[in-house]
Each structure stands twice: as structure tokens, then as C-alpha cells.
């Protein structure tokens, strides 16, 4: 049980980030009286899929890249991982952490014309992040280990007091009017945590850290990992539901709801903290968010630069850190809401592929599948993802009408049934074989 708890703390540290905290309260605001199906969809994708992805990834010492090389193709693996690292790195996650730090930590205390302040803040922020990323030290890890529990405790206290204090109770008109639409919207919002994508990238790091706890055999290792996953999942579910309720109960002014440039989650966090703890509490929250986001930013610059340097060694590690720092800086200055908006198409594309990949890896551990069938599965889910993104991004009614006719489309799972059908076909096509099961010494 002790090792399970330690493992749970490790998993919590991997997933916990200040950026994730803005989405549940924003969902609470927009869902109105359809809060519960919306937050359930968010928890399923934001917590459940992420933890299952991480745990399954710890069963292969070479991670998902090796699984894709073997089951699909090396080219597919490379393209997918490049897009994934760009998403959890300079295109979305890195600028989002910087923009979140500004929106919660700085924007509430500066003038309404925040553009020059955003530029000044991100310049200082990314210069410091670059200096640490070029020469990563263990000091940052130590700071993270101190900040994470402090920040988590602050958020828990804020949620409990906020739910007791505020009584708006979902009076805002919901953006989506049916239970299916509420679940589907929550499910897509859960993509924004980026945790499932991060699990694909960081499962090898997690496995290495887990092994240091000294498990005596594979059974104890797997038992502890699953227990930790369940405990972590429950913990994050409670945290997300609490933050969602905070947003649902907090009275957000109509002009804020109508302003597309204001992030509703950041607004709820900063204003509810001010209402409960006063100005000093708001300043404390801001400092915590800035520091937590900063440690995340440095970690993402390091991880992304290391991946690209290993995959494409023509450029040095330092060159990649310069490139990704500059890209993150540039995108962060368009503002938090626009960063989130621009990330949606890529997430709508990557998440179904990621979930299908995890399903293939899990099923293939127990059932012999054809390589041709697995390739067919990934082709189908990739095609549906591309078509869905084109239809939703460019408002192509003909495409949207076709997608809407697929089963589970209202729940944003139009790709799921075709994926399952292809996996069933994989069980009858020739040249089937089970995936390799590694013994404990190989893990």
C-alpha cells in the first residue's frame, strides 16, 4: 500500500499543472443546469483515458513509439510523435502555461490594456525558462515537489469554501441543451488537459521512476501501478468536479460571459479567490500559478528539445531549445483564449488516434491481431479525425451532416464504432499474433 501511495503521488505530480485548472470551472460556467453530464464527459477523457494511457505505456520498456513501429509503421510513428510533441510543447502547452500564468497571476492587478504587460511578462518568463532549459538542474524538480502539494492544498481549500459560499447554482443558460451534447462537449474539453498525449510521451520516464521504488516482482509492480492509477483517478475526479462546481456556482457577470477574449476559468479562479481570501489571497494564488506554470514550461521545453534532438540530431539540443522557446513566446502573446481556440483542431485530430492506439495495445496483449488489420484501424480513425476537423473548423455542412449520422456522434465519439469494427476484423485477417509481454526484468 505504501508503494501504491508513493506511485500515486508520482502520477499526481506528472499530471498536475496549473493550466489544467482553468478548464473545469469554465465548463461549470458554460454548462449551466447540464453540469453533471458535462463534467462526467470531462472526467472520462481528462482523467480516465490519461491514466489508462500512462499505465498501459509502462508495460513496454520502449514506450508507445516501439509499439507503433511494430504494429503500424515507423513512418506513422514518427509523424504521430512529432505532432504530439509539438502539441504538448511549443504549439499549445508551452504558450498556454505562460498565458495562464499571466491571466491568473498578472492580469487581475494590471490595467485593462494588458497587451504591453503580456509582452513584458512573457519576455521575462521565457528568458528565464530558456536559461534553465539549456542547463536543467535538480533545483527545479525540488521546487516542483514543494509547490505541487502546496498548490493542491490551496485549490482544495478554495473549492470547499467556494462551494459553501457561492450559490449561483447553474443559473447561467447552458451553451448546449441536451445531455448528449453536454457529455460530448465535456469530453472534448477534457482533451484540453493534454494529459493523455503527455502520457504517451512520458510513460518511459514514469516507468523509470516507478522502478526506483524497488518492486520485488511484476505482480507487485502491476498491482501498485493500478492501485495508484485508481487512487490518482479518484483524486483528480474529485478535484475536477469540485472546480467545476465552483464555476457552476460562482456568479459570472454577463459582460464577462459575452467577452470571448476573457477565459472564464481563469476569471472564476482569480475572482473567487479574491472574494474568499481578499487581495492577499489573490496575490498568493497568482504567485503559485506563475511558479507552477513556470516549472511546467521548463520541463516541456526540455522534454520536447530532447525528443527532437534524439529523433533529428542534425540540430543541437541548445538550438532546439532556442527554437521552441521563441515559438512558445510568440504564440503565448496572442492570449490565452486564442491559444486554446487554435489548439482544438489538433486535439480533435490527435486524441482519437491516441485512444485507438491504446485500445490496440491493450487488446493485442490478450488477442492475436493482424498487422494489416491494425494498420486499417489506424487509417480509418485517422481519416475520420481529419474529416471531422475539416468539417468543424471550416463549417462544412456536408461533412458535418455525414459525421452526425455516425453512431455516438452527439457524444463526440463518431470514430469509436468504426474503430471497434476494424479491430474485430483484425481478429480474422491472416498473419495474426499477440503483442509481446515483457517479463519484469525487461521492464
What are these regions (language model features)?
Residues 59-63, 67, 125-147, 212-215, ...:
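Membrane-water interface regions at transmembrane-helix termini and the short interhelical loops
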Residues 135-146, 183, 206-235, 254-260, ...:
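Hydrophobic, small-residue-rich membrane helices and short re-entrant helix-turn-helix hairpins
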Residues 90, 94, 152-178, 196-197, ...:
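Hydrophobic alpha-helical segments and their helix-loop junctions in multi-pass secondary transporters
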Residues 8-16, 86, 161-168, 177-243, ...:
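Hydrophobic, membrane-embedded alpha-helices of multi-pass small-molecule transporters
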Residues 48, 52, 150-162, 225-251, ...:
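Selective recognition of specific alpha-helical transmembrane segments in multi-pass small-molecule
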Residues 133-162, 343-355, 374-382:
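Membrane-interface loop-to-helix entry segments
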Amino acid at each position: 500500500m505504501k508503494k501504491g501511495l508513493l506511485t500515486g503521488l508520482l502520477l499526481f505530480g506528472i499530471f498536475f499543472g496549473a493550466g489544467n485548472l482553468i478548464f473545469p470551472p469554465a465548463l461549470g460556467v458554460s454548462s449551466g443546469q447540464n453540469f453533471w453530464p458535462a463534467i462526467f464527459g470531462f472526467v472520462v477523457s481528462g482523467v480516465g483515458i490519461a491514466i489508462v494511457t500512462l499505465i498501459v505505456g509502462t508495460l513496454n520498456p520502449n514506450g508507445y513509439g516501439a509499439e507503433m513501429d511494430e504494429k503500424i509503421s515507423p513512418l506513422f510513428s514518427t509523424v504521430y510523435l512529432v505532432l504530439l510533441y509539438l502539441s504538448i510543447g511549443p504549439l499549445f502547452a508551452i504558450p498556454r502555461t505562460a498565458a495562464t500564468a499571466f491571466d491568473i497571476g498578472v492580469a487581475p492587478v494590471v490595467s485593462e490594456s494588458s497587451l504591453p504587460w503580456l509582452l513584458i511578462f512573457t519576455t521575462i518568463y521565457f528568458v528565464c525558462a530558456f536559461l534553465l532549459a539549456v542547463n536543467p538542474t535538480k533545483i527545479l524538480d525540488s521546487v516542483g515537489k514543494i509547490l505541487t502539494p502546496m498548490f493542491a492544498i490551496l485549490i482544495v481549500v478554495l473549492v470547499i469554501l467556494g462551494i459553501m459560499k457561492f450559490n449561483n447554482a447553474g443559473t447561467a443558460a447552458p451553451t448546449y441543451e441536451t445531455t448528449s451534447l453536454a457529455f460530448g462537449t465535456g469530453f472534448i474539453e477534457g482533451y484540453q488537459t493534454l494529459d493523455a498525449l503527455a502520457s504517451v510521451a512520458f510513460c518511459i520516464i514514469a516507468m523509470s521512476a516507478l522502478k526506483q521504488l524497488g518492486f520485488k516482482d511484476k505482480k507487485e509492480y502491476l498491482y501498485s501501478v493500478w492501485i495508484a492509477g485508481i487512487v490518482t483517478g479518484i483524486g483528480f475526479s474529485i478535484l475536477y468536479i469540485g472546480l467545476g462546481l465552483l464555476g457552476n456556482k460562482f456568479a459570472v457577470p454577463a459582460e464577462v460571459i459575452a467577452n470571448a477574449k476573457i477565459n472564464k476559468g481563469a476569471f472564476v479562479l482569480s475572482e473567487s479567490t479574491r472574494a474568499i481570501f481578499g487581495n492577499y489571497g489573490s496575490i498568493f494564488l497568482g504567485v503559485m500559478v506563475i511558479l507552477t506554470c513556470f516549472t511546467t514550461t521548463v520541463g516541456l521545453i526540455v522534454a520536447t528539445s530532447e525528443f527532437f534532438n534524439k529523433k533529428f540530431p542534425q540540430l543541437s539540443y541548445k538550438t532546439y531549445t532556442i527554437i521552441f522557446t521563441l515559438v512558445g513566446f510568440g504564440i503565448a502573446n496572442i492570449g490565452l483564449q486564442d491559444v486554446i481556440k487554435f489548439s482544438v483542431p489538433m486535439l480533435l485530430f490527435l486524441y482519437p488516434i491516441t485512444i485507438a492506439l491504446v485500445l490496440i495495445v491493450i487488446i493485442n496483449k490478450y488477442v492475436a491481431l493482424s498487422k494489416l488489420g491494425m494498420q486499417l484501424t489506424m487509417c480509418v480513425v485517422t481519416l475520420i479525425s481529419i474529416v471531422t476537423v475539416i468539417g468543424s473548423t471550416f463549417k462544412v455542412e456536408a461533412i458535418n451532416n455525414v459525421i452526425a449520422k455516425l453512431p455516438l456522434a452527439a457524444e463526440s465519439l463518431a470514430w469509436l464504432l468504426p474503430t471497434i469494427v476494424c479491430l474485430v476484423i483484425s481478429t480474422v485477417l491472416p498473419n495474426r499474433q499477440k503483442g509481446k509481454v515483457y517479463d519484469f526484468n525487461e521492464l
